[in-house]
Amino acid sequence: MTRLWASLLTVIIYILSQFLPLLIVKKLPFVQYSGIELTKAVIYIQLVLFLIAATTIILINLKIKNPTKLELEVKEPKKYIIPWALLGFALVMIYQMVVSIVLTQIYGGQQVSPNTEKLIIIARKIPIFIFFVSIIGPLLEEYVFRKVIFGELFNAIKGNRIVAFIIATTVSSLIFALAHNDFKFIPVYFGMGVIFSLAYVWTKRLAVPIIIHMLQNGFVVIFQLLNPEALKKATEQANFIYHIFIP
């Protein structure tokens, strides 16, 4: 399969997995559902579709006969995948903490992404959703935003690699941020996209940003489920430190 077809199918499958549940529940036998029953039906359908989408996307991309120049370059040895992923995870968490402090100063009060809040509410009602938020979601997003959007742009832009990286990263990270539909948190998602793209280019392995993304999502969801008050205290302490250095 050519890379163009694989990329198009990857994006189409991802979009369908997002919106098909809403169309399916409008049909029999779901029309009799309402309230929490309807919500659960949508979520369970989406979980199944996500799993099918992830499996299909992986298989499609394994069939590519003409990989990008980046994918043909010498990759980091497999033994360094986890160390690089852990480093990337640390960078993402530090970045999020710094941006959260800035957002708190701008908007006042503890800032929590509405997107994250929705995921936490669903995870409390349907625990298996944690697996999909932590594993399947990041896998799908990295194939779409890093491998397809970033990868194709980086491959298409000729000349200076730094310029190509900046353009491809800016475009893919902005789309990644806008896709999360949290206007105030665009800087958070944009920065995450930059780190994921950097990890991909540096290691030449998509597995690295996928694992970083999985660790980040898993940590945030589990942390907020188990100890939501700890997040508030951590934010207050960070703000205290901020005011020491910047009165």
Swiss-Prot record:
It comes from the Bacteria. Residues 1-17 form the signal peptide. Its EC number is 3.4.-.-. Changing E142A: About 50% loss of hemolytic activity. Its main location: membrane. Disruption phenotype: Deletion results in decreased expression and abundance of secreted proteases, hemolysins and toxins, as well increased production of surface associated proteins. A subsequent drastic reduction in proteolysis, hemolysis and pigmentation is observed. In turn, virulence is attenuated. InterPro entries: CAAX_protease, Rce1/LyrA-like_dom. Keywords: Hydrolase, Membrane, Protease, Signal, Transmembrane, Transmembrane helix, Virulence. It is found in: Membrane. GO terms for biological process: CAAX-box protein maturation; proteolysis. The active site is at E141. It is a multi-pass membrane protein. One of its GO terms (molecular function) is endopeptidase activity. Changing E141A: About 90% loss of hemolytic activity. GO terms for cellular component: membrane. The chain crosses the membrane at residues 42-62, 81-101, 119-139, 162-182, 183-203. The keyword Transmembrane applies. Participates in the regulation of the Agr quorum sensing activity and plays thereby an important role in virulence. Mechanistically, elicits a protease dependent control of Agr activity without playing a role in the processing of the pheromone-precursor AgrD. Belongs to the peptidase U48 family. This is Membrane-embedded CAAX protease MroQ. The gene is mroQ.
